[in-house]
Amino acid sequence: MFICDCHCDTLTELYKKGTSLYDNDQHFDIKRQIELGGGLQFCAIFVPTHEFRYYGGLRYTLSLLDKYKKELKALQEKGIDVLPVLTKTDAADVLNHKAATLLAIEEGGAIDGSLEALRMLYEL
């Protein structure tokens, strides 16, 4: 069975708790995706604007992005097949992988009002 989990606070919770994308206490993780026969996990970078009102959102965004990239690299090094969905071609290929993730940035606090930051995040 293929499950798509759009519960987007996963990445934030992993960062705060220091837990892994592979096995955690959130609604869904990579381990459960594989056990169920496949899945897609949305991982949103959400900047709580009440904490980062005027600045700091970009730095927090980069911290979450770093956590995400490290988690994917660790899974890859262990030989675990996780597809990061980065393109339309990747999206079409999701069903051919045991697990997949889709990274998203939720709301504008992530860029601290900078279009340059937005362009650079897109490149990452």
Describe the residue ranges of each PLM region.
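N-terminal hydrophobic targeting/anchoring segments and the immediately downstream early-domain regions
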Residues: 1-123
